[in-house]
């Protein structure tokens, strides 16, 4: 509790908002065109705006700064209430997409002859969930685990009949009937899925499986939704038939009674407890003891157990391989979109604060933070990152949806399955690389931008603390970033090696088109130089860097170096692949008049400036590698690249407020008073602090534990506590 302010808040010294008002008045950027560019089209921009308005005006979903003060228990309850609220939107969103409002959607889906809902049918709700994640990531995850992990595991591994039964007849796809979680990770294994220890042993006498947790390390761990809410799980377990281990497969296992939520026989579940962030998620642990499920609860698109004497296991190797690529793609693709939306929020906060905040300089006319060159270097490249990731996020999502559609349409056609398998492999490379790189970059963005806001960035009410704690789990779950980077890089290196040997290698995505004999030869030429007199150079230099890094790795391996000892370089290859992919997608979009939606030349010019800044900033960040592999020379760096970088910063600074406005995020989505639209950082911040920490009637500010303080301050002199008798020698030693 604090004493009420005695300061006149209308004094003219509170002028932070004047700076932002002035910047907006002087801006020449077309905000609407920028927003359409960021949202991937006019209709998409309108949909995003409409959904945001619904979210911030919904009394259950809207989030204020008092959310930063709630306890874990309160957050769990709020999250449950919001899940129930979002379930009401879901049916409406599907009907809106299908343009059918008369029929009872739930009953239609339950019919055995009903068509399976597609990703397109769910696209409006998916967008709603993506936007909700900006203000409540835990809420988005709770539903995302059910729809994205539980649901997509069934979609990816189940037969059409199983998909229809679990997702439509049982109601899961509309958050009805059952609630699912995803039991892959165990206490002893996470990334190494092949070594998971939970078992599913087939019993031919009853045509059932027995699910068991053989030891402590096999306990399912970190399972979102398990602690309190999930009625079912998709469990990853080792298929055991006739004593033979067929590896890890997927099974639907009931956990709780659907009506009472009481645990079923053989199920033991506990709460993981406090975490760094996302306390709205009820992460739990699960142990199984002789849990019996019907054979039909094994997801059988790729592997089947055929009853008989003896029973047989039928596996389609190609399809089983596809299963390995498709299982976790959804989450990784969504995390790239999350990187765009979540990163944008903090770029807005830090940029607006940097414009409104003054520090040092003449009295009464101190310098705005954003006018310091170092501050520009700390803030503006992070803003550029948010612009660069947007087109890539939209493209990756589109590729993911179209590839999964091809997979389901391929049926048993081997040629089509081989084609879609190649696409899934390349999509795995891109999604793994982009997920890892962007979640790392946004984690760094949040903390770096927090520091640019000084002490005020440390306040919970300005969002950085909770934002960081909520975000960094993205660097670990659904594929640890280092493991994903290593895996994607090894796949890229293998493609390079195959091409170098003259082997026919399929490349299905634009981001990997640098893997051609012609470009490899060009990249390894000692005569290659970049003048940076055209836009293409800012992207191509990254492709050359990747080729030279890969060539370096391949040479070392050929001389006997173990590939694991080159892990640091492999992670760099993956990061550089992601940066190149983002630059290439952004460049292609700007060059495509029909896609870019930016007709105003001045506005388009600034999009190009952001493109150049992004490329140059990361070259500067990785200067050692570029110099070591002679992709650039020290003269180029000192005479061309760094001067251009330093030239771009003040140019972009001129329009930085308009560039934040283009995201069109209202204050209720930002939820940080130093980043609100009006720029009145001090009034907004002071008011939020005092509103959330109510004043005592007498303004005394005396805490409930005041006796501890008063007894300490009013304690006796130490002479009295020592009994009033001591030698001067003892006193001297005590006073030293």
Swiss-Prot record:
Q: Which InterPro entries match?
A: ACOX_C_alpha1 (IPR055060), Acyl-CoA_ox_N (IPR029320), Acyl-CoA_Oxase/DH_mid-dom (IPR006091), Acyl-CoA_Oxase/DH_mid-dom_sf (IPR046373), Acyl-CoA_oxidase (IPR012258), Acyl-CoA_oxidase_C (IPR002655), AcylCo_DH-like_C (IPR036250), AcylCoA_DH/ox_N_sf (IPR037069)
Under Enzyme Commission nomenclature, its number is 1.3.3.6
SUPFAM superfamilies, sorted: Acyl-CoA dehydrogenase C-terminal domain-like, Acyl-CoA dehydrogenase NM domain-like
* Taxonomic source organism: Kluyveromyces lactis (strain ATCC 8585 / CBS 2359 / DSM 70799 / NBRC 1267 / NRRL Y-1140 / WM37) (Yeast)
Q: Does the keyword Flavoprotein apply?
A: yes
GO aspect biological process, one term? fatty acid beta-oxidation using acyl-CoA oxidase
Q: Where are the transmembrane segments?
A: none
Q: What is this protein called?
A: Acyl-coenzyme A oxidase
Instruction: Give compartment(s).
Output: Peroxisome
- The domain of life is Eukaryota
GO CC terms of this entry: peroxisome
Q: Which residues form a coiled coil?
A: none
Q: What reaction(s) does this enzyme catalyze?
A: a 2,3-saturated acyl-CoA + O2 = a (2E)-enoyl-CoA + H2O2
Family to which the UniProt record says this protein belongs:
Belongs to the acyl-CoA oxidase family.
